[in-house]
């Protein structure tokens, strides 16, 4: 124990390690993005501003898409239907910084937890993410996405220590 304690103290002090519990729970937020018109190819659908998910307050650590099958057994039901896996295959989520530079793009389909062996997609970016600059874009619409659909994201975050 004498050997481990100084190492743990060093990692905490240098900010390379944080004390955390489960990656889900009190720091997980559901975000719903309903479509006000039918989705179009190449149109950027930006996230609404959110004080909790703003990178100045919190760091986004994980993200997942809740699809219609997962929602069928979930206790929370949004006003519109979450995307199906077929619809999710057509789009991408873009993580952006303060300058709206794209830091990463991830297929929506790969963010569906039940199709990813039950694992959520973890995030770790050097450049802070600005939630309202992030967007979703579709490169195909073989399966229509209408006003009866929405993108349901579950975002896990960690408070930024000041």
PLM feature spans:
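Beta-strand-centric surfaces of beta-sandwich/beta-rich domains
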Residues: 1-162
């Amino acid at each position: 124990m004498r050997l481990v304690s100084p190492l743990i103290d060093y990692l905490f002090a240098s900010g390379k390690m944080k004390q955390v519990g489960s990656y889900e729970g009190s720091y997980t937020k559901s975000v719903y993005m309903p479509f006000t018109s039918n989705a179009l190819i190449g149109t950027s659908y930006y996230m609404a501003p959110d004080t909790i998910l703003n990178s100045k307050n919190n760091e986004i650590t994980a993200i997942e898409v809740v699809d219609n099958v997962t929602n069928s057994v979930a206790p929370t039901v949004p006003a519109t239907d979450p995307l199906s896996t077929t619809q999710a295959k057509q789009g991408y989520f873009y993580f952006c910084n303060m300058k709206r530079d794209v830091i990463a793009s991830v297929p929506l389909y790969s963010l569906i937890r039940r199709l990813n062996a039950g694992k959520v997609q973890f995030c770790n970016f050097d450049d802070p993410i600005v939630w309202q600059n992030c967007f979703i874009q579709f490169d195909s619409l073989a399966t229509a996405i209408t006003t009866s659909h929405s993108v349901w994201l579950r975002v896990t975050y960690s408070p930024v220590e000041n």
